[in-house]
């Protein structure tokens, strides 16, 4: 197909499918991270397209912290059953035994033990040499400078000064024994691109992205949804019901909602057209300290 005749979204789709196929052909044991969010849903859709009518030739991996929204887990299991892909779910057993909680131990320690260490455990356990992730460059400044092929050493750490040039959509996937890469097929997409593609391709998403009246607590300027009985209220806090939706999804105590009436995809797209902030502003883990995300990525986080 003539690239000049492709729409903007078709060009992004073609680029992403090319990257997914390249990795599947070049690496021995790839895996696709499945965080259940909108970007993961788009990436899964692209992987299905890349190998249609065949089955996706690698498993999907969800690192479960035990603190995801209930609707996320329900959606994950329903989606795996619907499409029949190989789904691996990993929880850090040491973290579970320690009873790690974002309420008790804070966002930084919770993220390190349950997400970063849990991810590294799963990658080591299965010997994966390439892991797809749904991160985009427009989300956050450390992700903006990350390559499509993001090289990691034997400890899964990221050195932004030790990455390879990617000229003319050519990727060098050569790694030494014990090294691996993280791959980001959606690097050049924006949040608006994601929503427009979801709408045009009729991709299923977690209902939490759509506005609805839900129980929330206003904590330090963030609207935290009360998702289960483990929600710990601080002195002076009270539960209110507000029309909210989520621009990003993670562990429920660490993910802020936005007040919104947008309960259809066209209404969400309309909101995105006038949005002036990144969706990551609703993630508490990004505000632990200055450069917080880059520090986490250097330690092995996605």
Swiss-Prot record:
<dbReference type="InterPro" id="IPR011784">
    <property type="entry name" value="SO4_adenylTrfase_ssu"/>
</dbReference>
<feature type="compositionally biased region" description="Basic and acidic residues">
    <location>
        <begin position="280"/>
        <end position="302"/>
    </location>
</feature>
<keyword id="KW-0808">Transferase</keyword>
<dbReference type="InterPro" id="IPR014729">
    <property type="entry name" value="Rossmann-like_a/b/a_fold"/>
</dbReference>
<dbReference type="Pfam" id="PF01507">
    <property type="entry name" value="PAPS_reduct"/>
</dbReference>
<dbReference type="InterPro" id="IPR002500">
    <property type="entry name" value="PAPS_reduct_dom"/>
</dbReference>
<keyword id="KW-0547">Nucleotide-binding</keyword>
<dbReference type="GO" id="GO:0070814">
    <property type="term" value="P:hydrogen sulfide biosynthetic process"/>
</dbReference>
<dbReference type="GO" id="GO:0004781">
    <property type="term" value="F:sulfate adenylyltransferase (ATP) activity"/>
</dbReference>
<keyword id="KW-0548">Nucleotidyltransferase</keyword>
<comment type="function">
    <text>With CysN forms the ATP sulfurylase (ATPS) that catalyzes the adenylation of sulfate producing adenosine 5'-phosphosulfate (APS) and diphosphate, the first enzymatic step in sulfur assimilation pathway. APS synthesis involves the formation of a high-energy phosphoric-sulfuric acid anhydride bond driven by GTP hydrolysis by CysN coupled to ATP hydrolysis by CysD.</text>
</comment>
<comment type="pathway">
    <text>Sulfur metabolism; hydrogen sulfide biosynthesis; sulfite from sulfate: step 1/3.</text>
</comment>
<protein>
    <recommendedName>
        <fullName>Sulfate adenylyltransferase subunit 2</fullName>
        <ecNumber>2.7.7.4</ecNumber>
    </recommendedName>
</protein>
<comment type="subunit">
    <text>Heterodimer composed of CysD, the smaller subunit, and CysN.</text>
</comment>
<dbReference type="InterPro" id="IPR050128">
    <property type="entry name" value="Sulfate_adenylyltrnsfr_sub2"/>
</dbReference>
<dbReference type="GO" id="GO:0000103">
    <property type="term" value="P:sulfate assimilation"/>
</dbReference>
<comment type="similarity">
    <text>Belongs to the PAPS reductase family. CysD subfamily.</text>
</comment>
<keyword id="KW-0067">ATP-binding</keyword>
<feature type="region of interest" description="Disordered">
    <location>
        <begin position="279"/>
        <end position="302"/>
    </location>
</feature>
<dbReference type="GO" id="GO:0005524">
    <property type="term" value="F:ATP binding"/>
</dbReference>
């Amino acid at each position: 197909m003539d690239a000049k005749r492709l729409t903007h979204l078709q060009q992004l789709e073609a680029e992403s499918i090319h990257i997914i196929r390249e990795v599947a052909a070049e690496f021995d044991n790839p895996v696709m991270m499945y965080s259940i969010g909108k970007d993961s849903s788009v990436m899964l859709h692209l992987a299905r397209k890349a190998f249609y009518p065949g089955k996706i030739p690698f498993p999907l991996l969800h690192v479960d912290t035990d603190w995801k929204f209930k609707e996320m887990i329900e959606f994950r299991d329903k989606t795996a059953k619907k499409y029949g892909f190989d789904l691996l779910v990993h929880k850090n057993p040491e973290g579970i035994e320690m009873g790690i909680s974002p309420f008790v131990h804070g966002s930084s320690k919770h993220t390190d033990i349950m997400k970063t260490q849990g991810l590294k455990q799963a990658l080591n356990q299965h010997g994966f040499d390439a892991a797809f992730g749904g991160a985009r460059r427009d989300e956050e400044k450390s992700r903006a400078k990350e390559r499509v092929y993001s090289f990691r050493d034997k400890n899964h750490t990221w050195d932004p000064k030790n990455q390879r040039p990617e000229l003319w959509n050519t990727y060098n996937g050569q790694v030494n024994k014990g090294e691996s890469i993280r791959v980001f097929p959606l690097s050049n997409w924006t949040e608006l691109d994601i929503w427009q593609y979801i709408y045009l391709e009729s991709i299923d998403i977690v209902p939490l992205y759509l506005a609805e009246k839900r129980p929330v607590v206003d904590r330090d300027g963030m609207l935290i949804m009360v998702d289960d009985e483990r929600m710990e209220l601080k002195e002076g806090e009270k539960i209110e019901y507000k029309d909210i939706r989520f621009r990003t999804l993670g562990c429920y105590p660490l993910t802020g909602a936005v007040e919104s009436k947008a309960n259809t995809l066209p209404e969400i797209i309309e909101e995105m057209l006038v949005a002036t902030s990144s969706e990551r502003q609703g993630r508490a883990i990004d505000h632990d300290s200055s450069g917080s995300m880059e520090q986490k990525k250097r330690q092995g986080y996605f």
